Amino acid sequence: MSAVLAEHAAAARRGTVPATAIVLLGTGVVGGALLKLLNTGAARSLRLVGAANSRRQQTDPVSLAQRNLREQLNQHGAPRDNASLLAALDASEAAVKVIVDATASAPLAARHAEWLARGYHVVTANKALAGGELSGWRALQAALAGGGRYGDAATVGAGLPVLSTLRRLRTCGDSLLTLEGVFSGSLSWLFNQYDGSRPFSDLLREARQLGYTEPDPRSDLSGEDVARKLLIIARNAGFSLGSDEVQVEGLVPEALRALDLDTFLARCDELDATLAGRHAEAAARGSVLRFLARLNQRGHARVGLAEVPLTHPAARLYGTDNQFALTTTRYNTQPLVIQGPGAGPEVTAQALLGDVLALG
C-alpha cells in the first residue's frame, strides 16, 4: 500500500472531508504516471475517490491505495459506470471535486461540458473537445461561464507554459498575431535526427522502439494531433477556427493509410524516396526540414513539412523538444519563444497534477 494514498484511505474511513477529491479516468501511461505523483507529498491535500480504465473502475478507498491499482482494476474492479464514479465524488463532500481525464477518448471528452455544467471541475490531457469541432469548443466555453474550471495545460506541449502564457498576455490586452512552431515530440525527434545519412524509415522504426511515437506511427505522421494542438492554441487566442480550416499535409501517402499496422511497418520504407528528395532540395538551399504548425493574423492555419534556414529557431531544436514562437502586438520585433520537452508521461502527469492543485 502506498503511504500517501494509505493516509487518504484512513481519512476516508474516519469520515474526514478532503479539500479536493479526484476521480481519475484513464490509468494508462499518463494516468499511471499521475498515480505515482499522487503518492508524493505534493498531493497530500488531495484524495483519490475513484479510478477507472476503459472497462473497469474502483471506488473502494483501500483498493485505491494499493500500489498495483492498475492491475487491481483489471482483476477486481467493478464494471465501468460513470454514474457511480460521480457519486463517489459527491459522497466525498469535498469543497473541490475534480474529474481528471487522462485518456484520448472522444466520447469522454464530449462529456466535459456536461460535467462542468453540473459543478465539477475538469482537468485533462484529452485534446478531443477543445481541439475538435468548433461546436464542442463553444459548448465548453458556455459551460465554463457557469463557474467551473478547466485545467488544460497537459493538452499542449505536455504542460509547457503555452496556454497559461497566452492567457496572461490576453488579460494584459496583448493579442496574438502569428504562431509558429514544432508541436510534436515524435516529429521533432525524427526531423532533428534526419540528415539524409539514414533512411527515414529506419529512424521511424527506432523512434517507435524508443516509445517516442504512438504504437501506430501513422497517428504521429498524419499531423492530425499537431492540428488539434494548433486549434486549441488558436481558439484560446480568440480565433474561431473550425477543424476543417486547418490545412494538414501529412506524411503518410494514401497507399499506406488503410494498411494494417504490421504491413505498414513492413512497407514504411516507401516513405524514404520522397523525403530523401525533399531533404536534398532543402540542403541545397542551406535549409533543413521541420514539421511545423503555423497560424497567421488572418486565421490561416497550416500543419506540415517545411524548409527552414539554419538560423531559424526550429532548426536548433534537440531531441523531442517542442517549440512555440508567439508574435504578438507587444512581442513584435522578436517572437516570444517557449521551448522544452513536449512529450513524456511524467511531465504530462505533472501538468495534470499542477492544474488539480491550482483548483484548491
Question: Each PLM stretch: what is its role?
Answer:
Residues 66-70, 140-143, 168-170:
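Short, hinge-like loop/turn segments at secondary-structure boundaries
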Residues 2-117:
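N-terminal glycine-/serine-/threonine-rich beta1-alpha1-beta2 phosphate-ribose binding loop
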